[in-house]
UniProtKB/Swiss-Prot annotation:
Protein name: Zinc finger SWIM domain-containing protein 7
Keyword terms: DNA damage, DNA recombination, DNA repair, Metal-binding, Nucleus, Zinc, Zinc-finger
Zinc finger (SWIM-type): 76-114
Organism: Danio rerio (Zebrafish)
An example Gene Ontology biological process: double-strand break repair via homologous recombination
Amino acid sequence: MGSSLVSVAEQLLKDLQRTYSEIKQIPDDLLIALRFVFGPCALQALDLVDQHSVTCVSSPSGRKAFQVLGGSGRLYTCFTSCHYCPCPAFSFTVLRRNESLMCKHLLAVILSQAMGLCQQEQVSDQQMTHILSRQPEAST
């Protein structure tokens, strides 16, 4: 993807954040622009935001990760700092085919932050280690 498209996407997300903070909705022109820049995953990402599927998980040490409950019920841990999601769509359409800027999960994280609709969850440092290493936590 070209750097000019990335710049357009960044500006679009800034406009969305400003507009949503003022009127608490996304006007049609911004919805159309989202669809144009991000493709079909834009509406899917907005659906995830509407379903409150995005959670910002943070620990006392200051580590932070975002978890998105996908439509299939699978939980994806996304990282905005390095622009990564472990879902198959990210691997295929973003990394391999370079057809999209991001998957719906990563876009949902960015949109939920811009709209102030991200769920918050505090976890211990040990729990965060398990989340970041993608190891299931042992039940005790």
